[in-house]
Amino acid sequence: MMFRDQVGMLSGWFKGWNECEQTVALLSLLKRVSRTQARFLQICLEHSLVDCTELHILEGEANNPAIINQWQQESKDKVISQLLTHLPLLKPGNIDAKVAYMKLLPKILAHSIEHNQHIEESRQLLSYALIHPATSLDDRSALAMWLNHLEDRTSGNFSTQSRCRSDSLDYGQMQYYHQRQNSDDKQNGWPNSRDSGICVSSSGWQEKNTGCENGHLPLYSSSSVPSTINAIGTNTSTILSGQTHHSPLKRSVSLTPPMNVPNQPLGHGWMSHEDLRARGSQGIPSDHAPLSPQSSVASSGSGGSEHLEEQSTARNTFQDEGSGMKDVPAWLKSLRLHKYAALFSHMSYEEMMSLNECQLEAQNVTKGARHKIVISIQKLKERHNLLKTLERDILEGGNLRVPLQELHQMILTPIKTYSPQNSNTEEHNREADSQPTLLVAENQASESKDSASAGIQQHHISNCETESGGVPLPEGDLPGQFTRVMGKVCTQLLVSRPDEENISSYLQLIDKCLTHEAFTETQKKRLLSWKQQVQKLFRSFPRKSLLDVAGYRQQRKTSVDVLIGSRAFGQSNSLPTAGSVGSGIARRNPRQFQIPSRNLPSTRLSLLGASSLLGAPQRASASNPAMLKQGRQNLWFANPGGSNSMPSRTHSSVQRTRSLPVHTSPQTMLMFQQPDFQVPVTEPDINNRLESLCLSMTEHALGDGVDRTSTI
């Protein structure tokens, strides 16, 4: 955007403000200029006002205490009008006139708040008084009590206002708190501040603080001071995300998140929200031109929204329902391209997806940004194929952590509600959505040893697979494909061993989908149903049904490696390690069998000594069907939180199992006495035996929840 275009845009904004807003905006720009620039502007203004006799008359009246005192006899409407006209013309140092104003202002403010009249005019008067160089710290302290009263009065009907008229008041409010924090009335500024009429300073001047007469307003801060009261008083100020403060130009509806302000000494001046974002993020010098790209509307975090508010005829697709553009500002922010939000604010979703470098170049977008935008849009186009790839990976039984991360990133990108072009396509989609595929459920039913558990598992899996019909979805149906993948993830979560991190990530992802406008009500109902199923199964589903499925058998080798001599036992967060359970059982069984003092081959040590897998209680529990049944019944009900809620103290037992167990059984002694004992050659056979033995010990240990020595 050319400089003249920026000036024209700023002029358009300026014409739409009232006089108080114009004054505040000009002051906020003046704080960026140097002393030479400020003096030049003063000369220009004085030269243009030499022949303005009417202004001279008003200025004389504004500084005459007798005339000001006479206004108390006038009606409130006329007094407010007189104050708005004369108060800005009060000269610093005129104590008598200032006292007269300070007596009159509280009466006007009290009347306006009590009768809910002239609220806007009262806000402007309070803004003038709080930023006027003639008012001292004590004067601003006396007016400070009206800040909250006025805001409380206007907060009730604030939503009905099309513009934020309290912006100028924020400046006065912030100036008061800055003066309270810096009561010594020191500032960086001109030594001859009275001659200038205003007290302007710049961190670029590199001058020592000098006294500012009468404690009047300093217009520049040596640091980017945020517009939040609670942050005042610290050297490193931070915008608090929980507070809402408005810019002096327009309330921002941008999604720009809060940021940290550079670690600089706190100054007296105040800054607008846009100024803070521009200076804090870009780090521009203090004497930078106010119409630079860093402070232009196309560059600020909220520039796009403000530009669209000013131009009522412009189209703001960020606010249109179902446009698919609501998440564009946040998406651009994640790409560090948020300063181009205004460029996208008038585009439709289809226009954005069809952008190319030529179109961006015509909009004066830099080469690097053009390339980055085009690449990012190309990635948006590839989301449908990526979802298909994720679906295949999930069906193959891979790790769910990576697909869940991809889905979390994708849900933050712009997604538009799918609208079928004809009724045949819509009917086709409905048929595809209503066809359940029970591939995993059928396999589970055939392998399950418990018919009741298999029936429950089949029911839940079929519900999760409802969106996963075999008929491919249309290319543009991104929400439908996303929902289908969510169904696949739900299925894998139900048929595999519980993973607390994956389940938590999945539930968070569903919550985002439920609040997303791109998903239909039918899809949201499915997602909500899956959420409830995952939560329910994670809390109360029998362990046997979760362990007998094909998804768990694919992870056998990993679990066996963890059980046999692995130091990384924390990788499995669904079942307690055999060593911890075995040692716990051994402690509460008094039967003692001394082990012959002989050396064992290293093979036996790795198999037997690593986790105490072959202790007497374990063998006894494995050979006792009644005990196994009781253990399975109490496995989940004695511990409603599931195996993930086991206390971490059981891990200490694993550290003790590097030597042979002290207590063992005659069967174990017989095994030790065999001179040629070796690990079986068939790996699946030993895997099955170790797994069965580990599960038996686990179920027996968890079933005894009332025992004080239990691992629960």
UniProtKB/Swiss-Prot annotation:
Stretches assigned to the SAM domain: 321-381
Biological process per Gene Ontology, one example term: regulation of mRNA stability
Superkingdom of the source species: Eukaryota
Coiled coil residues, start to end: none
Keywords, alphabetical: Cell projection, Cytoplasm, Repressor, Synapse, Synaptosome, Translation regulation
Cellular component, GO, one term: synapse
A molecular function GO annotation: translation repressor activity
Keyword Repeat: no
Pfam families: SAM_1 (PF00536)
InterPro entries: PHAT_dom_sf, SAM, SAM/pointed_sf, SMAUG/VTS1_RNA-bind, Smaug_SAM
Region annotation Disordered: where it falls in the sequence: 278-325
Annotated localization: Cytoplasm; Cell projection, Dendrite; Synapse, Synaptosome
Family: Belongs to the SMAUG family.
Listed PANTHER family: PROTEIN SMAUG HOMOLOG 1, STERILE ALPHA MOTIF DOMAIN CONTAINING PROTEIN 4-RELATED
Its job: Acts as a translational repressor.
Protein name, entry field: Protein Smaug homolog 1
Species per Swiss-Prot/TrEMBL record: Xenopus tropicalis (Western clawed frog)
Encoding gene per record: samd4a
